[in-house]
A protein has these predicted regions:
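Anionic group-binding determinants
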Residues: 1-116
Length: 116
C-alpha cells in the first residue's frame, strides 16, 4: 500500500506574523562582492510575504531575524506568534532560543531532512 504525502506545511496561519518560516540557503558561489555566502529567508505563512537577508556566515541569522522582527512588528502593530525552522545549529543557539522564549514566541522545528 502506498500513501501520498502532502507537501503542504502542516502548520498554517490566517493572519500576518502568526507564523514565520525561516531557512538558510548556501553556501552560494561565487560569494557576493560584500563577501556574503548565505541567504536567510523569512516567509509569512498567511500572506506569503517574503524577505531575504544576505549573510557572511550562518550564525548571522539571529541578528538578521531581530532586525526583521522589529521592523515587521513596528510596521504592522502585530506580534510574532510562532517561528518555524529546521534543526540547524544557528537556530538552536541558546541566545536565539532565550530571545524567543522571553517574547513568548513558540519555536517549532521541521522534521529532519524535510524541505521548509
Amino acid at each position: 500500500m502506498t500513501t501520498n504525502i502532502s507537501r503542504e506545511p502542516t502548520i498554517q496561519a490566517t493572519t500576518f506574523l502568526e507564523l514565520i518560516y525561516s531557512d538558510i540557503c548556501g553556501p552560494i558561489a561565487p560569494q557576493t562582492r560584500g563577501g556574503n555566502r548565505y541567504i536567510a529567508t523569512f516567509i509569512d505563512s498567511a500572506t506569503k510575504w517574503a524577505e531575504i537577508s544576505l549573510l557572511k556566515t550562518k550564525n548571522e541569522v539571529f541578528s538578521e531575524f531581530k532586525v526583521f522582527l522589529k521592523r515587521e512588528q513596528t510596521q504592522s502593530g502585530k506580534t510574532l506568534k510562532r517561528l518555524y525552522s529546521d534543526h540547524g545549529t544557528e537556530y538552536k543557539d541558546s541566545e536565539f532560543e532565550d530571545y524567543l522564549k522571553k517574547r513568548g514566541i513558540i519555536h517549532t522545528y521541521s522534521a529532519p531532512y524535510t524541505h521548509q
